[in-house]
């Protein structure tokens, strides 16, 4: 459960993410695809090279969805309901991949904005990403 301090920390960190969703998202996805190649399973036939338009476009979608979740941090479940349905019923993504991607998102944030990712902010963002993962997997059965 995100405390009021966690929510404030996440919002503060996300002010530095806004406007960089494409770059951060592409970096996080690229790291996931290289370090954890099993994550490529859902992207057959897609150009997953580091500078590909597809990777940048999908990275922007991922991080923009998280930006939206931050904007609705008091109702993450409601704001991500359609995305949860899509991942559970249409895409059938292995829920373990959300853990992998969350790790690479945190790594990317630490790389691009180390001054923002203090230990307290790191903890809060990690809790936020865990909340998002829980919401995204809540409709799996």
From Swiss-Prot:
Database matches in InterPro entries: Globin (IPR000971), Globin-like_sf (IPR009050), Globin/Proto (IPR012292), Hemoglobin_a-typ (IPR002338), Hemoglobin_oxygen_transport (IPR050056), Hemoglobin_pi (IPR002339)
Keyword field: Heme, Iron, Metal-binding, Oxygen transport, Transport
GO CC entries: blood microparticle; haptoglobin-hemoglobin complex; hemoglobin complex
Gene Ontology MF annotations: haptoglobin binding; heme binding; iron ion binding; organic acid binding; oxygen binding; oxygen carrier activity; peroxidase activity
Tissues expressed in: Red blood cells.
Stated role: Involved in oxygen transport from the lung to the various peripheral tissues.
Family, per entry: Belongs to the globin family.
Location of the Globin domain: 1-141
Residues at which O2 binds: 58
Residue numbers binding heme b: 87
GO BP: hydrogen peroxide catabolic process
Organism of origin: Triturus cristatus (Great crested newt)
Record's protein name: Hemoglobin subunit alpha-2
Domain of life: Eukaryota
Pfam families: Globin (PF00042)
Entries under CDD domains matching the protein: Hb-alpha-like
Oligomer and partners: Minor hemoglobin is a heterotetramer of two alpha-2 chains and two beta-2 chains.
SUPFAM superfamilies tied to this protein: Globin-like (SSF46458)
Keyword Translocase annotated: no
């Amino acid at each position: 459960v995100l405390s009021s301090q966690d929510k404030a920390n996440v919002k503060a960190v996300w002010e530095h993410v806004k406007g960089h969703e494409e770059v951060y998202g592409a970096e996080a996805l690229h790291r996931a695809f290289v370090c954890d190649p099993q994550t490529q399973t859902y992207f057959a036939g897609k150009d997953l090279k580091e500078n590909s338009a597809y990777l940048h476009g999908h990275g922007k979608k991922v991080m923009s969805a998280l930006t939206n979740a931050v904007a609705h941090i008091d109702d993450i479940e409601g704001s991500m309901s359609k995305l949860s349905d899509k991942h559970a019923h249409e895409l059938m993504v292995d829920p373990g991949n959300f853990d992998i991607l969350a790790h690479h998102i945190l790594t990317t944030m630490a790389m691009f904005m180390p001054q923002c990712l203090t230990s307290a902010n790191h903890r809060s963002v990690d809790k936020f990403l865990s909340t998002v993962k829980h919401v995204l997997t809540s409709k799996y059965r």
